[in-house]
Amino acid sequence: MDDYSLDEFRRRWQEELAQAQAPKKRRRPEAAERRARRPEVGSGRGEQASGDPALAQRLLEGAGRPPAARATRAEGQDVASRSRSPLAREGAGGGEQLVDQLIRDLNEMNDVPFFDIQLPYELAINIFQYLDRKELGRCAQVSKTWKVIAEDEVLWYRLCQQEGHLPDSSISDYSCWKLIFQECRAKEHMLRTNWKNRKGAVSELEHVPDTVLCDVHSHDGVVIAGYTSGDVRVWDTRTWDYVAPFLESEDEEDEPGMQPNVSFVRINSSLAVAAYEDGFLNIWDLRTGKYPVHRFEHDARIQALALSQDDATVATASAFDVVMLSPNEEGYWQIAAEFEVPKLVQYLEIVPETRRYPVAVAAAGDLMYLLKAEDSARTLLYAHGPPVTCLDVSANQVAFGVQGLGWVYEGSKILVYSLEAGRRLLKLGNVLRDFTCVNLSDSPPNLMVSGNMDGRVRIHDLRSGNIALSLSAHQLRVSAVQMDDWKIVSGGEEGLVSVWDYRMNQKLWEVYSGHPVQHISFSSHSLITANVPYQTVMRNADLDSFTTHRRHRGLIRAYEFAVDQLAFQSPLPVCRSSCDAMATHYYDLALAFPYNHV
């Protein structure tokens, strides 16, 4: 019975196609003849006659045998009405599908969205929280209810937190977080444009007279510098108030110029630390005053100094001893742990985010130690290999460069170790020249940047272990490097500071000074660079050789890209004084121009 019905449907469909192609005058007798033959078909097949064209369309497309169940009367009327429409007759099959698709699209436009009639508001918020800003904007165009959900304050507050805007704020601080998000993105775009176009302001931090710069460090826009005279100065570049206070020492009986040179300086949000050539260590609390809160003495010269960036922990290395200092519950400083190593320590870092008990990493020649203050445990991470050339740590990893054994054997590499497991994770590089600096803590996730003796800056992919990008940045060795999600700032031994857009593999701009670049630190809106001379012996600083003295004393520059001013068209720092401020010292004039404030 089913085979007979299938043959009958195919025969009738072929007749209808022939009638659609025949002249109009021949359609009427053929249609009358077809109507005369229609009662001959059985009563069981007559109920399906109205749905024959739609069924035949599916059969001609290869749908196979017709379904066993019969269509309802409403469905049959709907299909029959579509089969009698002129557009369906002219389309002859393909047109019917297009018309049906158009009708379905129009019906969907008139339907009420699912969230408007089914879901509670809180559940809709939980679903929308997984959308980004573009998807939220599209959802706001669906209906009025979706617009209210897509512009909820909770969603835009979470977007601000996810993209790093206003991380310390709460949801009650602002009334329209969508507007705040737009303003933050506009500011971010402006800062990126200023970085690329070298648009902003640059200042040279005031130098201590008759001295040579020894060491520079910075944290969150606060700069600390040590000099050959034993002076230590601190600048807060966030307020553009460059009248830097001196951090005094306890030895008031020392005559000016008789204090030992400063070897190392470090700073974080609350502490400043300075190590001197005679083995003394001064610790200042920036919140209480300019006098040190603790003074510690080593028997020999301090070879390495480290300061934790998130708590009050100081680590020093002198001779074969490594000492960790931290305050107790009453606030008095004490020795938290003391270690003895068989070789002299060249590199020392404190692991961040270690909570109560500090952990340090020390490199001594061809040995690498993990030092834990909790039980004074000394764990050997790396031994009996090439000497270590550079070091950096993150919360759970340590990366250090090792010397190569020559191009015949093995090149210089960077080894990445897990601090928790104490085993090697990656071996990166394998280049001819030695790595001179590595930055793991400030790099984006799964990336790391390094500098080499060959003057090249390399980006390493920590997932694959390959070199993602290699830039020929400097003529001499790279001395400092830092990267973020789109740019690299590097400093070389020749005194050149270069800014690169590594996504485009393009150098944006560069600045030159006569001394090696020892320190580089930047944020989204500022950049701090320090050129420290190798030779710290004071040259003749009399009036006749003032230019020689200025050339050999070092330089600290602070760049600010949040202002709408060309960096290299701005007036020099000596020309930024007010009209009533005119000071001189050894002809180092602070000139005053009235048009500066016009």
Curated annotation (Swiss-Prot):
PROSITE patterns: FBOX (PS50181), WD_REPEATS_1 (PS00678), WD_REPEATS_2 (PS50082), WD_REPEATS_REGION (PS50294). One of its GO terms (molecular function) is ubiquitin-like ligase-substrate adaptor activity. Phosphorylation at Ser-85 by mTORC2 promotes FBXW8 stabilization, allowing its translocation to the cytosol in response to insulin. Its main location: cytoplasm. WD repeats lie at residues 201-250, 259-299, 300-340, 341-383, 384-429, 430-475, 476-513, 514-561. Residues 113-159 form the F-box domain. Residues 17-93 are annotated as: Disordered. SMART domains: FBOX, WD40. Pathway: Protein modification; protein ubiquitination. Residues 29-40 have a biased composition (Basic and acidic residues). GO terms for biological process: cell population proliferation; cilium assembly; Golgi organization; labyrinthine layer blood vessel development; negative regulation of insulin receptor signaling pathway; positive regulation of dendrite morphogenesis; positive regulation of proteasomal ubiquitin-dependent protein catabolic process; proteasome-mediated ubiquitin-dependent protein catabolic process. The modification N-acetylmethionine is found at M1. Pfam families: F-box-like. Residues 61-71 have a biased composition (Low complexity). Keywords: Acetylation, Cytoplasm, Golgi apparatus, Phosphoprotein, Repeat, Ubl conjugation pathway, WD repeat. The keyword Phosphoprotein applies. It is found in: Cytoplasm, Perinuclear region; Golgi apparatus; Cytoplasm. GO terms for cellular component: centriole; ciliary basal body; Cul7-RING ubiquitin ligase complex; cytoplasm; cytosol; Golgi apparatus; perinuclear region of cytoplasm; SCF ubiquitin ligase complex. Component of the Cul7-RING(FBXW8) complex consisting of CUL7, RBX1, SKP1 and FBXW8; within the complex interacts with CUL7 and SKP1. Interacts with GLMN isoform 1. Interacts with OBSL1, CUL1, CUL2, CCT6B, PFDN5, CCT2, CCT3, CCT6A, CCT7, VBP1, CCDC8, ARF1, TRIP13, PDCD5 and GORASP1. Interacts with MAP4K1/HPK1 (when autophosphorylated). Associated component of the 3M complex. Interacts with POUF51 (when phosphorylated on 'Ser-355'). Substrate-recognition component of the Cul7-RING(FBXW8) ubiquitin ligase complex, which mediates the ubiquitination and subsequent proteasomal degradation of target proteins. The Cul7-RING(FBXW8) complex mediates ubiquitination and consequent degradation of GORASP1, acting as a component of the ubiquitin ligase pathway that regulates Golgi morphogenesis and dendrite patterning in brain. Mediates ubiquitination and degradation of IRS1 in a mTOR-dependent manner: the Cul7-RING(FBXW8) complex recognizes and binds IRS1 previously phosphorylated by S6 kinase (RPS6KB1 or RPS6KB2). This is F-box/WD repeat-containing protein 8. It comes from Homo sapiens.
